[in-house]
Amino acid sequence: MRQWTIDAFATGPFRGNPACVLEPFDVWPADAWMQALAAENNQAETAYLLKTADPDRFGLRWFTPTLEAPLCGHATLAAAHVLFEELGVDVAMLSFETLSGVLTVRRADDQLEMDFPADPPRRTEIPEGLAEALGVRPREVWAGAYLVAVVDDETTVRQLRPDLGALKVIGGEATGGAGQTVVVAQADAGADYAVVSRFFAPGFGIPEDPATGSAHCILMPLFGDKLGAGRLKFHQAYPGRGGDLECENRGARVLLRGRGFTVMESQLRLEPARN
C-alpha cells in the first residue's frame, strides 16, 4: 500500500504544512491501526480515504499523532492533491464524507479550492492565564472552534514564544476544547497578504501547526468583517516554513485556496488491521 507526503498550502516543497495520505481503502481499517500509523508518521495529520460507488466521492478521516480530528484543511487539500495528481482521478470536483459533513474540492487554475463550513467567532473575555501563556496581552480574544488572540502587529506574531504547557489547558469559550489558540494580526504595510497568524495546538498533540485550513474558517469571517473584504490573502508564519492561503466568504461557507506539492512516496510493508 502506498503513502504520500504532501506539502499543503505551500509555495513550493518544504513549505506549507506536510500531511501523509494513504492510498484509498475498500473498507476502513481499525481505528487503533489508523491511530498507530499516524503516531508512526508523526506528522500533524495523516489522512485516510475510503472508496465509494461514485468515482468522485470518498470517505475521509484525519488523525493527529494522538487523536482523530473532526476537521482538517491542509490534509483535505493533500488528499485531493493525491487523488488528482498521483492517482489521476479525472473529475471536475471531489466530494469527501467527513465528521464535519460533506466537503468539496475542485481545481482553481494552479490551486485547489475547498468549500468548508464557516465558523464565525464571538468576542469573549481574555481567559485566565492566556496572556501569561502567550507572553503578551491580546488586544481582543474571540472564540470559535479555537481561541483567537488578536495582537498588535506582525512582529508580535512572529516573535511569539508561548509556554505550551500552560497554553495546553486554556480553552476559554472555544468549542473545540482546550489547548488550541490562533495568534493573529493585520500584516505589515507592503506585505502581499492581509493577515498573518500562527496556530498553537498542544491540546491536540501539535506544538505549532505550519498551515491550518480550519483556523481560516474562523479568521476569514472575522477579518472579512474587520477589513470590509469578501476575499483575503493570509500567511501563517510558522518559523522556517510558512503557509499561504487565499480565502473567500460565502455566507455560511468559506472557500480556501492553496497549492500542494508531493515530496515523498513510500510503501507500507504491513497490512491494515480491521475492526
Swiss-Prot record:
The active site is at residue 45. Its EC number is 5.1.-.-. One of its GO terms (cellular component) is cytoplasm. Pfam families: PhzC-PhzF (PF02567). InterPro entries: Phenazine_PhzF-like (IPR003719). Keywords: Isomerase. Gene3D superfamilies: Diaminopimelate Epimerase, Chain A, domain 1 (3.10.310.10). GO terms for biological process: biosynthetic process. Disulfide bonds: none annotated. One of its GO terms (molecular function) is isomerase activity. The keyword Isomerase applies. Belongs to the PhzF family. This is Uncharacterized isomerase CC_3221. It comes from Caulobacter vibrioides (strain ATCC 19089 / CIP 103742 / CB 15). The lineage of its organism: Bacteria, Pseudomonadati, Pseudomonadota, Alphaproteobacteria, Caulobacterales.
